[in-house]
Amino acid sequence: KTQADSFSWDGKAWHVKCSKMIEKGGNLIPSEDIITYVAEHVVTATGNHVQNTANLLNTKIAAIPVEHQYIVTEEDPKLIEYRQNNDEHPVLRDADAKWYVREERGGWILGPYEKNAPARFEYKVPENFRADLFPLDLDRIEQEYLSFIKRIPSTETLGIKDDFNGPICYTPDGN
């Protein structure tokens, strides 16, 4: 495991200086062991911090954090019955209705792919932002929720156990 500390472009290749990570007290921290990678292409996986990464690279990246709401249902007796003879239920994606659903502790997680979800952190994630959540706006995902109930009828009478609204990184067109 490594952490990228700095990078530079010499006109032909990237030079990426990294620290090897070590575990200390249950956390990964950088060690004194430094490695430099030389590469023609660098792929970043910085998610919501993509604009911070773009600034470091002195470039623009067409991705931005947007609000992503999802709900967790109470246990579904039909799903629990299914699990008595089967492995975990496969993830379902309804491309037309724009949502995914997966098993979660005997219930379901419904995550809509919202068109025009509000953008967050257009230029940089605030330094003090960790895993904070945004205010819910469940009206925005009502149609996806109704479609989910139609697709999986056993969910119609289930209560909502949890709901979340946090950032997820997408391209500006929401795809």
Say what each PLM segment does.
Residues 2-15, 19-22:
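A conserved short coil-to-beta-strand element within the FAD-binding core of flavoproteins
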Residues 5, 14, 50-51, 69, ...:
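Glycine-centered loop/turn positions within well-structured domains
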Residues 11-15, 34, 107:
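A generic structural signal for beta-strand entry/edge sites
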Residues 18, 55, 72-75, 102:
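Short beta-strand-to-turn element immediately C-terminal to the catalytic PLP-Schiff-base lysine
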Residues 24-41:
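Core beta-strand elements of the Rossmann-like FAD/NAD(P) dinucleotide-binding domain
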Residues 37-49, 53:
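Short hydrophobic core segments
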Residues 52-70:
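Glycine-rich beta-alpha-beta "Rossmann" dinucleotide-binding loop(s) and their flanking helix/strand
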Residues 59, 76-175:
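Active-site lid/adjacent beta-loop-alpha segment flanking the redox-cofactor pocket in flavoenzymes
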